[in-house]
Amino acid sequence: MTPVSGEGRRRIGESVLRKEDDRYIRGAGNYSDDINKPRQCYATFVRADIPRGRILSIDTSAALQADGVIAVLTGRDYADDGHGPVVHRAIEGDPIDFRTPAFGGDDPVALQFNQWPLPVDEFHHVGEPLAVVIAETASAAEDAAELVTVDIEHLPSVIDTRQAAAPDAPQIHPEAPGNLCVHHRRGDEEAVMRALAASDTVVSGTFDVSRVAGGQMEPRSGIGEYDSGNDQYVITAGNQGVHRYREMIASALRVENERVRVICPDVGGGFGPRGHVNPEFVLLAWAAKRLGRPVKWTNTRIGSFISDWQGRDWVLDGELGMMRDGRINAYRLRLQGNIGAHTICYAPPANASRLATTAYDIPNASQELQVYLSNTLPVLPYRAAGRPEVHYVLERLIDMAAAETGIDRLACRTQNLIARDRMPFTTPTGLTYDVCDFDGALAHVARLCDWDDFENRRTEAQARGRLRGIGISPFIESPVGAPFEMARLEIDADGNTRIFAGTQNHGQGHESTYAQVVSDLLGIPFEKISLAPGDTGELPIGGGTHSDRSMRMMGTLLHRISKDIISQALPVAAKLLQSPEDEVSFGDGKFQASGNQDGTPEVSILDVTAALAEFPEFRKSAATGLVAVAEQKGRINAFPYGAAAAEVEIDPETGEMTLCNFCIVNDSGIAVNPMIVHGQVHGGIVQGVGQALGENVIYDTASGQILTGSFLDYMMPRADQFPAFQLDEIYVAPDTPADTNPLGIKAGGEAGTVPALAVVGNAVLDALSPLGIAEMDMPFTSANIWKAIDAAART
């Protein structure tokens, strides 16, 4: 049976225009700040202006006298009301989370510290909330916040990774000696050292990966309410998963999960950091109950730079041994990550550690992972979390080794790829890839970027006084995410079909792709299907949207649900067809009976729901036509992979760099909507290239102040900096199916980001190589490039 839509064509695989785009384009989206409640008041936060200190006293008297002020609340008020810290707990039994016994046995690999929404004693970073001011208007609250005086004892701080790791560094938490919250080793280091010693060429380097801000289009915003009749807190806020927010907020308020309801309207960007609750949302819920009124807050853009979770921030030391024929013999890696002031999530170091050898067959590999606390904003997953970083360091080292040996960079990579006939392949870090054709992907992208003709383009650029370079890289992902999910489907008598999902749409096109799957499997018209907003009141559990998991998880659940719906509808369809059930089958979106007598050749699912009133014995609910629920326990593994190439041109007089070309192929499995996958890959490229070329959160290491606190200082990528990307068709190798789920889905949302740092960085260094420049830290801004050129000219 090949399920098709009622219109007689498949919906899975069709580039349908996104349902949600119409309202977004018309400005009719419903974001958190668009929502208002009767009698609402407004909150703003008094924030720490130094990186670390002890609160001696908070004087709120002047603020309380200001016009329109309702209350000024402190951490002492919060604690006195019986509330506690946010518990950023691990998922029990998760075998890939450093914090669980399932990973580390009885001796946890990672330390976990809880986070007070309003600290009573010590605070740990610039921008941390110290008090909340609530007033009748937002402007009144902001003005009054300036009147709050906080008496602080300054405490010594550490800002960057090297400071935190220094032997004499101030200790941020007494439970974390040396500021170290993770120290973990993988591989046989002694064997690696022997293999390095036996290698013909050994290259090494230290590579800094910059810290980035999320830069979401929509600043964080939310409304807290308290429903006294149901004794329930209600928080409406944009996020990446309402159920995780509910759990974290409930942990802080010290109530059962059922007493917290989280609703998510439209979301203007997530990228990872919005998958974990921020303290402000806990405080909105608490203040709403305390005051008996809804409390609303919307962050400012400058406020976002000093209070939103951030991403990346690594120091990577690598050493690569290569034999004379270009075969990689050994690889040793030390990863040092800066997790910031609070241990909210360990996914980035976990991902980096698991994928350290990427797409290569390296016989001897070891790594040491160290994660440090610092007095900076917490670092959380940011698009592709941990994967771009390890690709970057290994690809840089391969280019360096190729330069040392004189071996062509593409040939050097090709001969070291994990061969297709060795799948499934277990890496030195213990990760087992299922089916990947790395050689095919790399060859495909080499054709796309016209690798063989590049030297002619370099010569032509030199004639114009320009420097031209190219970088190429295979890549591999291992998207994981929460190991559980739930979905529900309801079809009413009029055929209106509603999907309830534990995932959370924030730009991925779920309203369209989920509808395409249901339309394809059940034959329901695409236009009749809608996706409900995220709401913990609708589903008891959900995993949220992160780590390229949503379509794989929801596709699996919608497939199960469709089977359930067909099973439920079968008895009614048989009645309508006046045939025994065992003579009725479902195919092509219709029920059909062999040998029916009344001339009715087929019955649709919507015919069944319309007729259910005549057959009450088959109805599950008086209010619903057909309803089905499905739950997934455990991750659905996938290994999307591909290859990418970037080509750049540099003006040596000014350092100005132009990205001339970016090519990528990606085996994302079956694409439910190829246009949406293309869009996701485009966005991923921009975020990866944006970091390589300019994005960089800069802290003053002496004062702890963020120096890039606005878009005047923080360089966001612009459309005019990018060429037309070459994606070709979505690359799906015919013999690399994703058999872990019924729809054959892998992932595509992070593909553009994973290789971007590596291919852009190597392209820049390749362009500069005629000047003798072999090393340079990101970001590769025009200023940094010019400084490198100038320094090379002076030596």
Stretch-by-stretch model annotation:
Residues 120, 218-223, 315, 469, ...:
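Short glycine-rich loop/turn motifs
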Residues 112, 120-122, 256-264, 287-300, ...:
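Conserved catalytic cysteine-centered active-site region
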Residues 270-292, 296-298, 510-518:
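Thiamine diphosphate
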